[in-house]
Amino acid sequence: MLLYVTDYLARFDSGFHVFQYLTLRAILGVLTALVISFVVGPPMIRRLKFVGQPVRSNGPTTHLCKAGTPTMGGALILVAIAAATLLWADLSNRYIWVVLVVTLLFGGVGFVDDYKKLLAKDSRGLTSRYKYFWQSVIALGVALFLYFTASVAAETELIVPFFKDVAVNLGGYYVLLTYFVVVGSSNAVNLTDGLDGLAVLPTVLVGGALGIFAYAAGHSGFAQYLGIPYIPEAGELVVFCGALVGAGLGFLWFNAYPAQVFMGDIGALALGAALGILAVLVRQELVLFIMGGVFVVETVSVMLQVASYKLTGRRIFRMAPLHHHFEIKGWPEPRVIVRFWIITVILVLIGLATLKIR
């Protein structure tokens, strides 16, 4: 929005041309989202105290003391991301609208889930059937839109990391891949969001890394040099990634152990979907699988636990997702959180290394 204002003012003062630079607008997106989080956060948390989070009766006993902690704090993240993006991004860029709409719609699904938990005082929330139905509708809708509006072949190709010039033409399978990446990423982050700050910092790290991929993919010179596909509209996603980083760090200020507020599904489902659609837009789905390894392992632990119990009557882990397994083994919550953060830092660095190792 402000890009149009600065474009007009540049007619009278050339100094306003500085706002054309993506890097500056990305930094301003980070700072804007951060300031919004710090300003809006405290009063929002005070209001949310009237709607405390019910705690699962079958969860770790150490979590019982968290009953009543305000939830739905993800609304703060969405407000900060949306405001910062709308202020500093080029709103004529279709990718900006795609990532914003997907993030907010998945946040809407999460809001309904959280609302049902709070209204009925039931920690289970929205039934899985309805949750997956609406997630599927949104994901398939955006996948079809992107498939039919693709302007270059690279937009629907699967890029294989670590190998130079290896791209698989997906054709119609692009829609299926996009669906699984967006829905899978959304639910993976949601499963990981079980400890204070556990999900939000990895989301920030992965989102920031995807911003680097977006900047490189949107610049023809960098894309050619690094051997990644050039996607003309991808560069503007750096502003959204900046807003995500700022909003995530701002929320972490209140969500760090011991948490003053929980993200809730409104935040976790939205952030996971944002990472998924970002990876799709910059054609780095496989790299997302690497960088988001913590999310992947958490999800796989649940799948293995359910499958093992149904097939053999035995559980592989003491409790799933995996972070609860370590809690029950006696690890203090902060230790689990920080070690998962460290693993994410390592995985993100490996993901970024794919830019050069080909």
Curated annotation (Swiss-Prot):
GO BP of this protein: cell division; cell wall organization; peptidoglycan biosynthetic process; regulation of cell shape
Keyword Transmembrane helix: yes
Keywords associated with the record: Cell cycle, Cell division, Cell inner membrane, Cell membrane, Cell shape, Cell wall biogenesis/degradation, Magnesium, Membrane, Metal-binding, Peptidoglycan synthesis, Transferase, Transmembrane, Transmembrane helix
EC number: 2.7.8.13
UniProt subcellular location: Cell inner membrane
Any one GO molecular-function label of the UniProt entry: metal ion binding
Cofactor(s) for this UniProt protein: Mg(2+)
InterPro entries: Glycosyl_transferase_4, PNAcMuramoyl-5peptid_Trfase, PNAcMuramoyl-5peptid_Trfase_CS
Family that this chain belongs to: Belongs to the glycosyltransferase 4 family. MraY subfamily.
This protein's name: Phospho-N-acetylmuramoyl-pentapeptide-transferase
Native source species: Nitrosococcus oceani (strain ATCC 19707 / BCRC 17464 / JCM 30415 / NCIMB 11848 / C-107)
Gene that encodes it: mraY
